[in-house]
A protein has these predicted regions:
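Hydrophobic alpha-helical segments that mediate membrane insertion or helix-helix packing
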Residues: 32-33, 110
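C-terminal terminal-subdomain/extension
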Residues: 5, 71-125
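Short, surface-exposed secondary-structure edge patches
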Residues: 1-6, 23
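Short, charged beta-turn/beta-strand-edge "cap" motif at the junction between a beta-strand
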Residues: 18-22
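Compact nucleic-acid interaction/catalytic patches
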Residues: 24-28, 34-70
Length: 125
């Protein structure tokens, strides 16, 4: 990955999470949405992301899940779910490529779901 690539909030990245994984932590090549702010994305060696899954039929709905259709983004060839309960930092070194971006409305829903995950909304605590 080109270290000078400008990563922006809302970008969809392919990330190499390695072959080893445990439990619900997914390994291999994963699509992820960038949720960290653009100032951090510019200067930090770490990017905060939310993993995506295309297994929409297998997932129970949680308030931390955001459905993403192909029309709401570029770079995905099928509908996916942003798993915002799995927000995580990644090193830039594991980014393989930027493949697209979610639209502003979807990014707003992902932001709200991340806020639910970290306890911003009292009704979910």
């Amino acid at each position: 990955m080109d270290k000078k690539l400008k990563i922006r909030r809302g970008d969809i990245l392919y990330v190499d999470m390695g072959e080893e994984y445990e439990g619900s932590i997914q390994g291999g090549m994963r699509p992820m949405v960038v949720v960290s702010n653009n100032l951090a994305n510019k200067f930090s060696p770490v990017i905060t992301v939310v993993p995506l899954t295309s297994r929409t039929y297998k997932k129970k709905y949680l308030p931390t899940h955001v459905l993403i259709s192909e029309q709401q983004c570029t770079g995905l060839n099928r509908g996916s779910i942003a798993l915002c309960e799995r927000i995580m930092p990644i090193n830039r070194s594991v980014i393989v490529e930027r493949v697209g971006k979610v639209d502003d409305e979807t990014l707003g829903k992902i932001t709200e779901a991340v806020q639910i995950q970290v306890g911003v909304y009292e009704e979910y605590n």
